[in-house]
Amino acid sequence: LVELAEKQQRLLSIFHNRRWDGDFLTVRRLLAEGALGQVAQFESHFDRYRPEVRQRWREAGGPGSGLWFDLGPHILDQSLQLFGQPDWLQADLGKQRPGALADDYFHVVLGYGEMRVILHGSCLVSAVMPRFVVHGSQGSFIKFGMDVQEEQLKEGKRPPAADWGVDPAPGQLSQIRDGQLVQQTVAGEAGDYGAYYRGVCAAIRGEGENPVPADEALAVMALLDLARESDQQGRRLPCQKLSD
């Protein structure tokens, strides 16, 4: 597709819509502001309680099936947006539900020097778990709940509704100031999937950059495959640049 787009002189853009999740935008802003200092640990969770295996292709065990290929692209892309290419990764993929044919659990660790990025997903988590947990040299941020845009669409809402993308659950920011722990709630940024389409429109018109160029999607695909290889080999694997 990349070669065809170049040959036909067309724009090729990938729908990594979760770059515009409200909770992710909030985390991105806090990191850009240096609110947590030097990040030491970043956790991104997609935990669910779906104990029954359903009859659908995502759970049938064929090519492209499984929780890692379903949710991994989203949280890998978000991690790459924040921190760039990792030095190494180690993955553990599992089939935990009775009768599961495709992986329904993943725990993937990305190494960036001494910093660790943890990507975790499961279908057997009944407790309310945080979506993001970030620890740094000057504080921590914890955010519960999922971005609301998908549910709003299912309810028939459309932008520009007044509450579009507005997350009702604030995050918890804990900072060390003058040696004292200070805690406060942080209202989330409004999610905005429409920003992707506006970006594509601007790129087609020559008025802006491609919001998600193909090479960024290829980097995600390479890490998805590398994680499967890591799981199969049971060891940490180095991450090479896509050009390598």
Residues of each region from the PLM?
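Aromatic/hydrophobic pocket-lining residues that form π-stacking "cages" and hydrophobic walls in ligand
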Residues: 1, 27, 223-227
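Catalytic-core regions built around general acid/base machinery
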Residues: 1-7
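A short acidic, glycine-rich active-site loop
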Residues: 63-69, 160-166, 186-187
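C-terminal helical cap and adjacent loop that interface with cofactors, partners, or active-site loops
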Residues: 165-244
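Predominantly a Rossmann-like dinucleotide-binding segment in NAD(P)-dependent oxidoreductases
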Residues: 8-13, 18-99, 107, 234
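A structural signal for well-ordered alpha-helical scaffolds and beta->alpha junctions
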Residues: 20, 24, 72-79, 144, ...
